[in-house]
Amino acid sequence: GEGAYIFDLKDDAYLDYGMGLRSVNIGYGNREIADAAYNEIINGNNLTRASVTELKAAELFVDIIPSAEMVKFAKHGSTVTTAAIKLARAYTGRKFIAVPIEQPFFSFDDWFIGSTVIKLGTLEEASNYTLKFNYNNIDSLKKLFLEYPNQIAAVMLEPATIQSPCTSNCTHEKNTCEGCSNIENNFLHQVRELTKLNGTLMILDEMITGFRWNLNGAQTKYNIVPDLCTFGKAMANGFAVAALGGKREVMKLGGIEEPGAERIFLTSTTHGAEMSALGAFIKTVEIIKRDNIIEHYWNYGKQLKQGMNQIAKDLNINDYFYVEGYSCSPTYITKDKSGNVSMSFRTL
């Protein structure tokens, strides 16, 4: 890969829509980021004790992510989302976790994946404590709190995907609305109020939105302060790193600051503080700031959506192919003659 293109064995170039499953946000083979990673490799890459690079990365993370007073690094998203669930259960003394039905993935661990249709090989009892509600429907979440009083440890959700966190009286199309972002009573604020009222933690999963919606996270765009938050994907332009951040009061339960206190085995991640990935993270943030990358996502994405939808309309296939979602992270939809989503059409 180079820039926005990937090449096959015949050296044919393809413009890459997915960009490393959205983990590559600056471009393939970026020399500055590669050099930053290489410099850490020749300095040892993975040390027994915490490195200065890890310290710098941690200081940078808590500086740019408003809700993060502490941070723990890992290698992939499932590690940190499951760690967040452990913290929530330990902090509240409760068992149940609520997640939106519409958001398809939070972890490959049994607590979540066992609650989906792809559950072969999981333990049923592990997912018995995972509850589902409807995104943008606060009443469906209120219903869970009534059914499970004082039993829900956390509500975990992505701040936005294709769907936007709208206000109750939003008149926009739910899959295209970008207008409710800064309104104080959008869905995320309703969730935050409800979790506080019930002594439940709010966990924002920013795997997709992080370092794409806003340098300081979608939590900044929507002016929301979660108890815990998780990041990954575009943190380091394709290098493997993820992060769990949050309030010190909660995060410290996974630390060793209080001798004799009962501890959480928060993560097992030998390579979690690998210096090459953390060096890439530091350089990626530097480039995002320097080159106004986030602004470019929004501006170029808007043009891309409009242009592709116009082409589809000109070809008279706009009922079967169209682009929707946020301008900084557009998604293309393919449908068959019956109007059903078609994955085989998507491969074309």
What function would you assign to each model-found segment?
Residues 1-348:
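Conserved N-terminal phosphate-binding loop of PLP-dependent enzymes in the Aspartate aminotransferase
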